[in-house]
Amino acid sequence: MKCIWLGQAGFLFITHGGTTVMIDPYLSNTLEEEQGPAYHRQVPVQPEFLCTPDVLLITHSHADHMDFGTLDVLFEKVHRPLTVLAAEKAFWAMRQRYGGKAEFVLMTPGTEVTLADMHFTAVSAAHSDPSSIGFVLEADGVFIWHTGDTLFHRSLLAQRPAVVDLLILPINGKGNNMNAVDAARLTRILQPAYVLPMHWELFSTFGCAVQPFADLLAQDPVRVLIPAHYTEFVL
């Protein structure tokens, strides 16, 4: 599976069969325009990634995950069937705004959906939007767990799949997210092959250094991935 980090919690996944999946894309300057310089992007937008995927995943309703500045552009470009899998609060907001432009599916922990050559499972997240979820994606024999924004919570452990090839999780320790210590602790328990820290680099005010997280796992068998933005890597 091909993976591209779009910044913050946003990713684009492409299966061997060509199915494209985008999760939590924030590809605008909406937050800075609405809330000021604390939300100035450290990573510029690359407009070529403002393309409509086959499947869009939204973990929760916060504006750096359900960004209407990005989503309005994506929905304007819809030229093929689009399915949106969204947490409850985001589901209702998006369905009201975009109506019949997509097939909207309400995802709560435990919900499973198979689309084309990908299987999606919603898992719990402990965040300030109570309807927040994470996603486990399965395709091409690869299991990816994107936790969404979350604190360390025992409910995450109860839902873990038998194998996690790539774990994607926040480390910034702000806004009801795990800090580096708790993120490393969760990583050790889940024992993925790879871990990719997210949600630390886009806004300096709400970010953190990534090296302390990597250092905490330096003696562990897991490989820490810190890919360049908008650059493809393959699992």
For every predicted segment, state its role.
Residues 9, 29-30, 62-66, 91-94, ...:
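Active-site environment of divalent metal-dependent phosphoester hydrolases
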